[in-house]
A protein has these predicted regions:
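A structural signal for small-residue-enriched, beta-sheet-centric alpha/beta enzyme cores
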Residues: 1-200
Length: 200
């Protein structure tokens, strides 16, 4: 429900979420699964950056592929081409960011951070794909995680992606999977835009 002071999700909140979805009520940012989400938690919450829930979609002819993701990762978010840190572990001394992969090598040995992290996303498409093909698409979409989150897929993360389809448009699985990785990457990068004006 977007209010971090209220109770954990239960059946009544799940029912309300379904009603909201049916009515077309949806908010990106620090709402729903984005509430309280943070990234760059290797040194703990004090140096983490706020994260969010975001979406991104493209259309190629009649084919539509979209992604939704809530980023709550132990790692940082990086620009895919330059490698610049966009958000993550804060350097409390100079206000910049600390490289998450370098921090991983020394900071978390012997610490249990598993329960604090998960990046969870979904791919939604109108491609005609069966369950096996959609599982493959979800796997290919993980490339989007790996392009912009580092470290990613660690044992401290519960990274997962699901895929679903209205199954109306004939499409090649390789095309759908490649686009899925792209839109997931873009959705993750979009969470940074919501973070800049938010506190943890």
């Amino acid at each position: 429900n977007g209010n971090p002071t209220q109770k954990y999700p239960d059946a009544s909140l799940g029912y309300q979420a379904c009603e909201n979805a049916y009515q077309g009520i949806f908010k990106e940012g620090r709402h729903g699964a984005g509430t309280g989400a943070t990234i760059g938690k290797i040194y703990g919450p004090k140096q983490a950056s706020p994260s969010a829930l975001a979406t991104y979609a493209v259309q190629l002819g009649d084919l539509k592929v979209g992604a939704i993701v809530a980023v709550n990762a132990i790692g940082n978010i990086y620009a895919p081409t330059s490698g610049t840190t966009l958000s993550g572990i804060r350097n409390l001394k100079d206000g910049g960011f600390i490289d998450a992969e370098e921090a991983l090598y020394t900071a978390i040995l012997g610490r249990d951070l598993f329960h604090q992290n998960t990046t969870i996303g979904a791919i939604i498409t109108n491609a005609k794909l069966d369950k096996t093909a959609l599982t493959k698409v979800a796997g290919m979409a993980h490339d989007g995680y790996a392009r912009v989150i580092k470290p990613v897929h660690t044992t401290f993360d519960g990274d997962s992606i699901y895929a679903m389809s209205s199954s109306t448009i004939p499409a090649d699985i390789n095309v759908v999977g490649t686009i899925a990785a792209y839109v997931m990457e873009k959705a993750i990068l979009k969470t940074v835009d919501f973070n800049e004006s938010s506190g943890v």
